[in-house]
Structures are given as structure tokens and as C-alpha cells.
């Protein structure tokens, strides 16, 4: 378990602390209070984790002893890292692979690195923002490299050992002004590769095998950075191995794992930005009326946090049901143009004030159970409190999720009926897990620590008391049958 500058190993049955790793950080990082890490990785006898100061470390799983410590990036004058590594690593074929995010004031955009799992040495680096003169480099409206930002990778990737591919999602650009300018010259597009894309990389070399850009020229902060689920679904009566992902708009795209070819899309109906999706290519056509205009505020659904965000979905491979945590929101969206010099200095130029949907009824939290193979919705649960945790689905037909009102709840996977809930000290804004010890089944979730989902939804439900609280691990034992 990670919290700020510390990592703890606990006895899963008793909660006893087995070891703790504490990292010394520059004063500017406030002991890692602002850091967010979504996962750790274990490979062999080593545990791998990013740190708030831009390093990746390997620890012995049994003792917490440092095996190696590698600086992925150089700190600034105040000791802060120019990028974050909030997604956590994935390990494939002896490579620890992790992406960077933010870098809102760092031109050139983000990247994904592959480190040797034994030594920590960097093996390769892939830039998620295409450079001029390289493949995709002509998709930035002719902007020089120092005016290209974003492409953050702030969730972990997935690995397919059969195809030897790792899949990552990317975010948007941080300054839309580059893409709003008139086309500078023939042959230059404004697609902004490789933002809002699924990337398939060779883990040995970091070479791009294929990419699929879900939203070209994203000027609305619609990140497609979330989990890349490796699923097998019937397509035209034949079991087909797919990679499935969904963006902030709660549109899900299914692609062939080997080629990236579009297979199908599912729109859950909580957005007003995309008016149509090409069934052959998956290209999403945005509503031209929502094009940013200086001095004009426009209604955008969802808000910048999205109808969905980093909280992961859960999938039942037997029934093909995907369980999706959602928040029903909109935003008043505006754009302030900036000069090329201001763009090169960093920062962002779009703004959004969260607001309820015009057709809303005061309920913002939503769980949707959808058959991915057919598109049929099995059930929907709606409630006032926005959801702030990943979903956990179990073989015992339970679905667990946490909400802003501090409740951690279990629902029947087949019907959506509420079966159990308990209120914690703070919002359970993490990814719950389940495990067994000596035949006993447990469910664990972390609460507290704040985060953008908790703060970004707070204005919708001002009556909900959600104290920041200290980070707390809660563990529940499931009753024996």
C-alpha cells in the first residue's frame, strides 16, 4: 500500500505492518502529500513503484529493502519533477514500463519509458507527442516542438504475452490554441498525434506497432487515457480477442489487439460532444456548435472530470457484462486565446465550471451494467452521491464501489440490488481489491487523501460532508457460505 512518500507491506489477515519504506523528499514536495499513485507492480521477488520526485524504485517484496533506484527525469531548481508518474507501472518481459503525465509547463509533451527490471537502467523511451519530421509530426498544425504539450499517460498499461504488446492510453493537449489556429500549410493536419489514442508498443524496444486515435483534435479535455481491457467477445459469431477502452465521454471503443482495427463502439449517452461515430473506422465526429470561441461560454457534457475517469470498470468474461462507474455532469466551458509566446510558456487556456445536466434530477452517481457483445443494458443504478472509486466485481455476483458520501457498497451483479453498505471515515476513492487467506475471503479499500474526483464533484452536492481525513485502509471479511 502506498501513501505519499511511504509504502507499507501488511499482513492481509491481521493488518500487521511487515515493513515500511519511507522516502526522503525535497521540502517543495511537502512529503509527497500531492502525489497520487494508482498502482504498484510485483515481478518475481521485487515490487516496483514510482516516487513523487520522478524516480522508479525496486524493493524486495519480503523486506522492503531497496534493490535499485532510477531517476526517470531531472528535477527543477526547487527539486520538483517536471512530470508526474501517477499511473503506476506494468512489467512485461523483464521491462518495467510506465508513462508520465502533467508537465503542463514542459514543452514537448509526455513519454513512456521501459526500464530493465533487474538493474533499473532505461532501455527505451517513446514520446507520446510526435516530433516534427517524425511519423505523426505533421499533425500539429505546423506548430514547433516547443508549442506541443500533453499526451499524458496517467493510468497503467496492459500486456498481451501472445502478441508481445503493451497497450497504453493517452490524454489531450494542455493548450488548445495550437489546434485552433487556421491551417498553416498544405499537408499539416490538426489531429495532434498521439493524443487521445490507444498505443500498442513492443515492450522489448518501445517501438510503436500501431495506434488508434479515438478523438482527433481534442480541444475539450476528453482524455482517452484509461484502462486498456484485454477481452474476448463474440464478433459475428466468432470469439475475438479485443482491447477495449473508454474515454471521459463514456464512449467505449473495441479494437483488434493485433492491428488496432476498429471493431465497434458503445456510447452510454452521457455526452453531447460527439454527434456520430464512423462504424468502419471508429472516427468520432464532434458537434461543430461546441467549437471553442473566444468570449463565449458553451454547455459541455460531461465536465472536465468526465462521465468516467480513472476509476476502472469491471468485466465478467462469462456474461460479457461490463460494469461502469459513472458521474452525470456538465460544465460551462470557455476558451481564452493566447499568443505563441504564452503558449510556449506553458499552462492551459480552457476553463470549465461544473454544473448539473440540464435534464438532471439531482442524482449524479451511476453504475451501468452493459453487455459489451450486444450493447444491451442489463441494469442501471443511480444515486445522488457521485462515485469516486473503481468497481470490483467478484465471482460471487457482487459489485463493490465507493461514493463521495463515504459509503462503500455492494450490489448484486445480476440485478443491481443494494445488498450491503457501510460509511467510512472519508470517501473510498481508490481501487478495491479482493483476496483470500487460508480460505477466508477479504475485500479491501483505501479511503481519504482527497483527490480531483472528490473535489471536482463537491459543488454538485454541497450537503455531503466529506472530511479529507487521513489515508486509511479498510478490510472486510466476506461471510462463509
Can you say where each PLM-predicted feature lies in the sequence?
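Beta-strand initiation motifs
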Residues: 14-19, 63-68, 119-123, 205-209, ...
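Extracytoplasmic beta-rich repeat domains
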Residues: 20-41, 66-88, 127-156, 173-175, ...
Amino acid at each position: 500500500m502506498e501513501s505519499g512518500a511511504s509504502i507499507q507491506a501488511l499482513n492481509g489477515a491481521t493488518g500487521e505492518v511487515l515493513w515500511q519504506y519511507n522516502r526522503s523528499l525535497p521540502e517543495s514536495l511537502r512529503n509527497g502529500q500531492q502525489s497520487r499513485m494508482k498502482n504498484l507492480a510485483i515481478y518475481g521477488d521485487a515490487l516496483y513503484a514510482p516516487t513523487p520526485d520522478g524516480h522508479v524504485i525496486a524493493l524486495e517484496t519480503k523486506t522492503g529493502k531497496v534493490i535499485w533506484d532510477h531517476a526517470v527525469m531531472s528535477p527543477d531548481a526547487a527539486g520538483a519533477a517536471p512530470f508526474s508518474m501517477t499511473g503506476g507501472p506494468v512489467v512485461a518481459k523483464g521491462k518495467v514500463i510506465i508513462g508520465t503525465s502533467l508537465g503542463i509547463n514542459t514543452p514537448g509533451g509526455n513519454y513512456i519509458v521501459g526500464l530493465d527490471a533487474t538493474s533499473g537502467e532505461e532501455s527505451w523511451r517513446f514520446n507520446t507527442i510526435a516530433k516534427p519530421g517524425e511519423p505523426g509530426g505533421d499533425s500539429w498544425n505546423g506548430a514547433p516542438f516547443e508549442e506541443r504539450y500533453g499526451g499524458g499517460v496517467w493510468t497503467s498499461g496492459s500486456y498481451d504475452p501472445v502478441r508481445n504488446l503493451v497497450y497504453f492510453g493517452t490524454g489531450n493537449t494542455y493548450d488548445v490554441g495550437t489546434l485552433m489556429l487556421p491551417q498553416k500549410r498544405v499537408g499539416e493536419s490538426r489531429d495532434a498525434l498521439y493524443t487521445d489514442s490507444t498505443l500498442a508498443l513492443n515492450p522489448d524496444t518501445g517501438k510503436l506497432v500501431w495506434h488508434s486515435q479515438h478523438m482527433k483534435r481534442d480541444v475539450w479535455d476528453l482524455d482517452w487515457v484509461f484502462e486498456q481491457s484485454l477481452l474476448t467477445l463474440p464478433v459475428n459469431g466468432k470469439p475475438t480477442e479485443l482491447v477495449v477502452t473508454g474515454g471521459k465521454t463514456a464512449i467505449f471503443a473495441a479494437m483488434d489487439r493485433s492491428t488496432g482495427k476498429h471493431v465497434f463502439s458503445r456510447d452510454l449517452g452521457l455526452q453531447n460532444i460527439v454527434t456520430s461515430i464512423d462504424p468502419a473506422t471508429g472516427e468520432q465526429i464532434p458537434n461543430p456548435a461546441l467549437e471553442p470561441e473566444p468570449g463565449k461560454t458553451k454547455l459541455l457534457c460531461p465536465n472536465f472530470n468526465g462521465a468516467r475517469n480513472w476509476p476502472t470498470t469491471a468485466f465478467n468474461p462469462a456474461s460479457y457484462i461490463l460494469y461502469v462507474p459513472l458521474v452525470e455532469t456538465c460544465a460551462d466551458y470557455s476558451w481564452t486565446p493566447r499568443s505563441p509566446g504564452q503558449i510556449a510558456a506553458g499552462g492551459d487556456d480552457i476553463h470549465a465550471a461544473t454544473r448539473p445536466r440540464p435534464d438532471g434530477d439531482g442524482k449524479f452517481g451511476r453504475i451501468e451494467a452493459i453487455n459489451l457483445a450486444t450493447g444491451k443494458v442489463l441494469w442501471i443504478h443511480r444515486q445522488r452521491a457521485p462515485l469516486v472509486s473503481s468497481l470490483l466485481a467478484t465471482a460471487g455476483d457482487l459489485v463493490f464501489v465507493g461514493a463521495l458520501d463515504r459509503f462503500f457498497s455492494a450490489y448484486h451483479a445480476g440485478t443491481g440490488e443494494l445488498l450491503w453498505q457501510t460509511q467510512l471515515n472519508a470517501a473510498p476513492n481508490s481501487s478495491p481489491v479482493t483476496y483470500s487467506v487460508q480460505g477466508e475471503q477479504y475485500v479491501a479499500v483505501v479511503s481519504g487523501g482527497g483527490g480531483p474526483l472528490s473535489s471536482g464533484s463537491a459543488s454538485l452536492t454541497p450537503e455531503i460532508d466529506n472530511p479529507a481525513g487521513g489515508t486509511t485502509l479498510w478490510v472486510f471479511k466476506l461471510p462463509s457460505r
